């Protein structure tokens, strides 16, 4: 079998068809018989998958996803969850044997067969009267087999004891003997069945909500893709109409180019239509999978008792989590706009007729390439008729270069009072201002990041808020400048049409300016993200610092301030001593003394300073005030 169960989508209504039954195999269309689970979360009967494996890999018939097989059987593992639902459904009732006489009861005899909830065994009508006639069985709960209680306590397969506890660590049901055999560390993870059931239901509900959210997003993505398919169709039709309208006025000279343009539009249409439909087909295979698993969750909750839920519930949760965490392409991979650059092509084709200069045609081609996203020359290149637009790829207006500043300086050095030169003068001033603010923010964020990670210093939350506020303000300024710059494109376009020889350089500078602003904005976004990431850590560290060391900064600041005052006073006293004219005679007398005593003035001037420093330290230790002036001995 090719595996193409879901055929090509014929329209939006095909996605609204009723989904398949969750207990019916998509290949054989009957109830599952030993269902096997693939890595893509699709289930198939073991018989339907037998013989499909190649080199240890099995390709899913629905989504073509390959599953690596483990083991010599050549089949994926049995889906215990789906097998439980099949066994628990009404269509999967097996033959029951009487526990006393081994009489097999068929499906027609289910109503005449009984089940003892106390003994946990099925009984036929004759054995019910014979074995449970005694008085000791008078309190046994005997009901019809179809009405037996699903809450009958299951027993441990190792110790034949009823399950009492559940290990949240190993996800296993435990009897009392299993609990005694466990290590003491593992016993802390054991809870009673009721608590484990409540916790499991809560976790399963969260998983179901995640799947429902993915289901809603998938439906929205499918609707969006369907709308984009229609937009592609309408866009192609509009583009063809425009091409036909322009071709009608110049039929003789544009016959060959018309066919080429239509071929380009058709090629783009087929490419985009194929891409959208492939993505749509992928999402269409995902949606039934989500629906099936939601139905499985609902059926499992209604059919499973507590023990069965705890036995299989976490497997279901892991499966739902796996479905949600798988990569799903919910967004369109390309735009729905089709552009053929027909105006530039027609202008080039009509150049001999309309006597257009090559530079003017080049300007029209570059403008059309800008509007069409640069798709024109590549889209119009055919296998047998190469487009002459390819020769225009050497146009100087391609992308911003790294020599914008040099080109701007050369342009301004010419001294001409053109509109673009005035714009460049204004732009350079504003850009320099924005760049300076950006550099300031960079330095500040780097310093804060270094203080936080390397020095582990205390950073106030107000500082981070101020940095974030400045970053947002800078982003607004950059956006405003970019919008203002973008709004002048029309004005400059008219000037470039009139004087194209100078426009080539000006356009290069202009595009580079836009690129610089976008780069600044991107850097600012990075800084904003880093600031937002650092802010919670700064606040938490500040709170811890305030709790642990509330008076950590005060003594250090007072001591540093007092030392600074001492140093400033000593310098002021030295300066006043030099400026005092009364010290001149004394200095002359000292200079007349022998040279052997020339060290004495320095010693006398340094000794009071040392004494004053010792006096300052002693007063600071004793809690005294620090003097702001000093007395020099005469």
From Swiss-Prot:
Annotated positions binding Zn(2+): 98, 101, 127, 132
Consequence the record notes for mutating residue 603 to A: Associated with prolonged QT interval in heart's electrical cycle; behaves like wild-type in terms of protein expression, subcellular location and shortening of heart's action potential duration, when expressed in neonatal rabbit cardiomyocytes
Any GO BP annotation: positive regulation of membrane repolarization during cardiac muscle cell action potential
InterPro entries in alphabetical order: PML-like_CC (IPR021978), RNF207 (IPR039320), Znf_B-box (IPR000315), Znf_C3HC4_RING-type (IPR018957), Znf_RING (IPR001841), Znf_RING/FYVE/PHD (IPR013083), Znf_RING_CS (IPR017907)
B box-type zinc finger segments: 93-145
Entry coiled-coil feature ranges: 422-457, 494-518
Keyword annotations from UniProtKB, A to Z: Coiled coil, Cytoplasm, Metal-binding, Zinc, Zinc-finger
ZnF segments: RING-type: 25-64
Keyword Nuclease: no
Effect of residue 25 to R: Loss of KCNH2 up-regulation
Region (Disordered): 552-634
GO cellular component labels: perinuclear region of cytoplasm
A matching Pfam family: PML_CC
Cellular localization per UniProt: Cytoplasm
Single GO term (MF): Hsp70 protein binding
PANTHER family in the record: RING FINGER PROTEIN 207 (PTHR22635:SF0)
Subunit structure: Interacts with the core-glycosylated, but not the fully glycosylated form of KCNH2/HERG. Interacts with DNAJA1 and HSPA8. Interacts (via the C-terminus) with HSPA1A; this interaction additively increases KCNH2 expression.
Function according to Swiss-Prot or TrEMBL: Plays a role in cardiac repolarization possibly by stabilizing membrane expression of the potassium channel KCNH2/HERG, or by assisting its synthesis, folding or export from the endoplasmic reticulum, in a heat shock protein-dependent manner.
The protein's name: RING finger protein 207
Primary gene name: RNF207
